[in-house]
Swiss-Prot record:
Belongs to the universal ribosomal protein uS2 family. HAMAP family: Ribosomal_uS2_B (MF_00291_B). Keywords: Ribonucleoprotein, Ribosomal protein. The keyword Ribonucleoprotein applies. This is Small ribosomal subunit protein uS2. InterPro entries: Ribosomal_uS2, Ribosomal_uS2_bac/mit/plastid, Ribosomal_uS2_CS, Ribosomal_uS2_flav_dom_sf. GO terms for cellular component: cytosolic small ribosomal subunit. The lineage of its organism: Bacteria, Bacillati, Actinomycetota, Actinomycetes, Mycobacteriales. Coiled coil: none annotated. Residues 254-277 are annotated as: Disordered. Gene3D superfamilies: Glucose-6-phosphate isomerase like protein, domain 1, Helix hairpin bin. GO terms for biological process: translation. The gene is rpsB.
């Protein structure tokens, strides 16, 4: 069964690129034609690259890998958060802080601080403090939640990242490449394919296109989680290859994530002055 259909891609506007005057010549091989000054992306290639990306993500997760979903533009924020949450993966949909990957030790400390503040708030740790102190702690917690809430359970550098709009997320892409973390991304006609390991030629500006392709990647994660749990679709035989033990929170996700399917229709990480992509 196809991961996604041509009709779904057409209905979501995945084939629409940018104006012909706004393009990257390296994308020429992915362009089918131009119409009324707009490049039309070759969806046959899109389907082929979707299959490659899907298999890579599934295999990565099956072997215990983690996929970080990144999309901070308005068109992608909702779907990135929803789909990553559906399959228990970390995400960044508000802003990318410079050093989030390359300086992960600092990120981890800030995540610990966030959890500490949340625990204080829930267990009465704010009691006995002045209103000014409580206000300061609350603001600190809210700021950390906005910046790092989507990766609160990310204990290590991800095995791969999914990116909506590599131009906007150039800092994230640069950090991933520096660390050798594979990049899976939508490639619009103004993007540089050399920056991406698993490209999916498509429209990264349309909400429906970003949502559809993000859902595809999340579904690949869900299937990878099933394999990791020792399931093999169709024959019910256990997976013989050794994989990392499945955490309890991922076991809880399996029933919901596995049954979901596509519908046919650089700065530091201190609290001050975060870098926004």
């Amino acid at each position: 069964m196809a991961v996604v259909t041509m009709k779904q891609l057409l209905d979501s506007g995945t084939h629409f690129g940018h104006q012909t005057r706004r393009w990257n010549p390296k994308m020429k091989r992915f362009i089918f034609t131009d119409r009324n000054g707009i490049y039309i992306i070759d969806l046959q290639q899109t389907l082929t690259f979707i299959d490659k990306a899907y298999e890579f993500v599934k295999e990565t997760v099956a072997r215990g890998g983690l996929v970080l979903f990144v999309g901070t533009k308005k068109q992608a924020q909702e779907s990135v958060a929803a789909e990553a949450t559906r399959v228990g993966m970390p995400y960044v949909n508000q802003r990318w802080l410079g050093g989030m990957l390359t300086n992960f030790s600092t990120v981890h400390k800030r995540l610990q601080r966030l959890k500490e503040l949340e625990a204080m708030e829930q267990t009465g740790g704010f009691e006995g403090r002045t209103k000014k102190e409580i206000l300061g702690l609350t603001r600190e917690k809210n700021k950390l939640e906005r910046s790092l809430g989507g990766i609160r359970d990310m204990a290590k550098v991800p095995s791969a990242i999914w990116v909506v709009d590599t131009n906007k997320e150039h800092i994230a892409v640069g950090e991933a490449r520096k660390l050798g973390v594979p990049v899976i991304a939508i490639l619009d006609t103004n993007c540089d394919p050399d920056e991406v390991d698993y490209p999916i030629p498509g429209n990264d500006d349309a909400i429906r296109s970003a949502e559809l392709l993000t859902t595809v990647i999340a579904s690949a994660v869900a299937e990878g989680l099933q394999v990791r749990a020792g399931l093999r679709c169709g024959d019910g035989k256990p997976e013989t290859e050794a994989v990392e033990p499945l955490p309890e929170w991922e076991q809880e996700l399996l029933a919901g994530a596995g049954s979901s399917a596509l519908n046919d229709s650089g700065a530091d990480l201190s609290e001050a002055n975060p870098t926004e992509a």
